[in-house]
Amino acid sequence: MLAQATVQLGGHGVEVFDVPGLRRMRSIRLGEHGAVEVVFSRDGRTAYASQMETASVWVIDRRTYRVRRHLATRGVWSKVLALSADQRTLYVANWVSNDVSVIDLRSGRVRRLLPTVRTPRGLWPTPDGRRLYVAGFEDGELERIDLRSGRRKVLLRTGGAMRHLVGDPRRGRLYADDMAKSEAFVVDLASERVRRLAATDSTPNTIDLSPDGRVLYVSNRGRNGACYCAPGPEWGSVLAIDAASGRVLDATVGGNQTTGLDVSSDGRLLAFSDFLDNRLSLFAIPPYRVLAAGGGGRATAHRAELRKR
């Protein structure tokens, strides 16, 4: 992780920071609005940034920081992005139009719009290109779409608010978090059976796996106040959860609404953002064997620090 890209939801684009110093290197303006999500191509040369207000995706050259293309999604309120394993297709979840844009990256055109469960957010396409999993926020649904036939199946309905998805194809697992139920789930991809993995702190947001697939990191906003747009009565947090057993291995307290989260490709660094503080934090993280031998770290102790004094 030599640089960290951060979206400006209330700004005008994307900011780039160096690692580990977190010095702001560049601001990339994306028209008159901010960005929601950023994903990178496998070779790290291209960044894709979604923009809700314009229902579009900005394609950015990582070396020059210049915008290469601006792609329309044909959806409404475009948010989460996911690249296919062959890097030829970009999937975009459209929050208001309840569909996913399937964009051919060679032509830049929308190949088709896939209907989904209500308010789609998290996305995960399987490496074989046959299935797309969708997290439905409105009703707490986890949906699987057959990308050949378009057939859909809801695997889980919690009545909560399913938010983010991350897959482990080597072990045949898919992880999901529910923001309203404060829970993390795991799907066995062979049988498509779903089980509850762990309870999280209040209002979980983003999840990510360590590169070895053994630790699931979860950012948690903390309890909302009268409005999610203002600081609530709790600080946010980040949990490190054993991806197999669901045991919380460690925890740290964040700031006001801990949201964005990412683990570096070498598994040594964890970055997270505190949404209402306009702040990034960077942590060195130990390997699994150290976390597993740590007796739970601050998994219990941190809870006493969540409520603001």
Give, region by region, the residue ranges found by the protein language model.
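Predominantly soluble domains enriched in secretory-pathway, periplasmic, or organellar proteins
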Residues: 1-309
